[in-house]
Regions:
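Membrane-interface helix/loop caps of multi-pass membrane proteins
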Residues: 1-233
Length: 233
């Protein structure tokens, strides 16, 4: 609809979905072709918020000649957002999924890794263990976790922590692990650069297929066709 197009173009799609109490994982009628832009909306909202948080903390840290205010400030906001995510996911799971307040901690986890990583020193064996653990968790959550578990909440810790493990384990080039070298392959790097674009493009194609075939259960062949079309576009 025009209404949803305007909200998605203004990077407010997630707020519209909250207002409508949309269930992201609902099974039945095809979703809106603009629904997937909730993720881009939250990203833009976070990037608008981040300078407002980091700027004053950096100013104070520079004045004090210490990174403690920056570390402490980001950690506090991270903790508040995580607790909010736990509570909102438990009581209002549908709206919590799209709520930027409960998603901020996921982004700030990356900020905390960037802040603390210069002080993290690992030997190669420890780095290898952490990298394999990170990749194992990342694959496991996509296969083993029930689709009816509420998200984000504590469940979001698994992909966030696994990503942090992989980044931390590859911090020092001379101690790069097998996982780090594999993920540095130029084809995987290229795929990673395209991944979010594919993620956004596949959704309207998926919705079109669901409307065309009058079902939300498209099967493997049509599903792979959607992925290929998403890559080509």
């Amino acid at each position: 609809t025009i209404h949803e197009f305007i909200f998605s173009a203004g990077h407010l799609e997630n707020l519209l979905l909250i207002r409508r109490e949309v269930d992201y994982l609902q099974i039945g009628d095809p979703a809106s072709p603009f629904q997937q832009y909730w993720a881009l909306s939250i990203q833009v909202q976070f990037y608008a918020f981040l300078p407002l948080l980091i700027g004053p903390l950096l100013y104070i840290s520079n004045k004090m000649k210490s990174l403690i205010p920056l570390m402490l400030g980001v950690s506090i906001v991270f903790f508040i957002s995580f607790v909010y995510s736990l509570v909102s996911t438990h009581f209002t799971p549908n709206t919590a999924y799209f709520n930027p307040l409960g998603r901020v901690w996921e982004f700030l986890a990356g900020a905390l890794v960037a802040i603390f990583i210069p002080y993290i020193k690992l030997n190669k064996k420890t780095a290898s263990i952490i990298s394999f653990l990170g990749i194992f968790i990342l694959f496991s959550i996509g296969i083993a976790f029930p689709s009816d578990w509420n998200f984000p909440g504590y469940v979001a810790l698994f992909p966030v922590v696994s990503a942090a493990f992989i980044i931390i384990s590859g911090n020092e080039s001379e101690k790069r692990t097998l996982v780090n070298r594999l993920l540095s392959n130029r084809y995987l790097v290229m795929l990673g650069a395209m991944s979010f674009t594919i993620y956004l493009w596949h959704w309207p194609i998926l919705v079109f297929f669901q409307h065309y075939y009058e079902t939300t259960n498209l099967g493997v062949v049509k599903g792979m066709t959607i992925v290929v079309l998403g890559v080509l576009l």
